[in-house]
Amino acid sequence: SDVYKRQVLKFGDFTLKSGRKSPFFMNAGAYVTGSQLKKLGEYYARAIHETYGDDFDVLFGPAYKGIPLGVVTAIAYSELYGKEVRYCSDRKEEKDHGADKGSFLGSKLKDGDRVIMIEDVTTSGKSMEETVPKVKGAADVTIVGLMVSLNRMEVGKGGEKCALDEIKDLYGFETAAIVSMADVVEHLYNKECQGKVVIDDTLKAAIDAYYEQY
């Protein structure tokens, strides 16, 4: 209900980056205040720790939304688990001047680094097509896995498996999410939040129809 109250998860009619029409939309960028971002970083840090453990060096958040995600998660990881991990993000436009010129923000990737990728959500896996070659091309690194906030649980571009499973099969690293859409529906169906039922029968039917299609 926290993500609903903060308008991070919205219900309605949305056209996604993939072109799909969806009855729900997840936007971790709606976390905008200090306390909200602190909590978001803790969500990611706990999920990463539970899924992947401590054997990694760098949190990589693809530009643009992944930049603050990498920063707040690195801070939270240090506070929660006492482990210093570096953060790195790519630049959309390469910087050609100054001490930090190049294609990346934050820490430089080094040979031997073990990297965990962070995104808010992935629908079709398209962003990984751009990000994975950049990360692999920067140094001899191992991508340990990907963590997203929400597993939308819809099929990826191949039309058979969900996007997270497609990414796992294509690139050979693990994928995970803080929550799945099934968790969200179970938690909010016929439940009141801020004086109204969040997912009523009509919205539940729209979500079910979406999953029949995708």
Where are these regions (language model features)?
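Short, small-residue-biased leader/transition segments that mark boundaries at the very start
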Residues: 3-4
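An N-terminal, well-structured beta->alpha segment
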Residues: 15-55
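Solvent-exposed alpha-helices and their adjacent loops that cap or buttress functional pockets
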Residues: 17, 106-111, 168-169
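Short glycine-rich phosphate-binding loop at a beta-alpha junction
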Residues: 54-65
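PRPP-dependent phosphoribosyltransferase catalytic core
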Residues: 133, 137-214
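Short helix-loop-beta connector
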Residues: 52-56, 109-112
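A contiguous pocket-lining binding segment that forms or flanks enzyme active sites
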Residues: 104-151
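Short, glycine/charge-rich flexible loops or terminal/linker lids adjacent to PRPP-binding catalytic cores
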Residues: 71-115, 129
